[in-house]
A protein has these predicted regions:
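Long, contiguous binding/interaction regions
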Residues: 2-18, 22-60, 67-117
Length: 117
């Protein structure tokens, strides 16, 4: 998997799923661990564009588009949920028989998964 100039992770074999990670809020100190999780999963360096979260001044936000094999959204959600004070959602749209899915996470409520169409 490689990261193109638009900061989109793309697999060399054009796998069957793509999606978006939206980090709604994360402390500035945890931005590097978020990028490390994504780099570990994509096997390529990841540098996100972080923006101040206007609702919570001590937090930042970012988004990341990816393309990979089916199941990548679950891997991203599993990797990120261990990061303190993060709030995110990740979607996966599959071109095969697998379900499209969305994972949402907040520290107080934990992780939520739903099939989407």
């Amino acid at each position: 998997m490689v990261i193109n100039s638009s900061n989109v992770a793309v697999t060399a074999d054009f796998s069957r799923a793509h999606g978006t990670l939206i980090v709604h809020a994360c402390t500035k100190a945890m931005t590097a661990p978020v990028e490390w999780v994504l780099a570990d999963l994509t096997k390529a360096p990841v540098k996100l564009d972080w923006y101040n979260q206007t609702i919570s001044p001590s937090m930042v936000r970012a988004s990341f588009e990816w393309s990979a094999g089916s199941g990548m959204a679950a891997k991203i959600a599993s990797g990120l949920k261990a990061i303190p004070h993060i709030r995110f959602e990740v979607t996966e749209m599959s071109s095969g028989p697998d379900f499209n899915q969305r994972f949402c996470f907040t520290p107080g409520l934990g992780i939520f998964r739903a099939d989407v169409n």
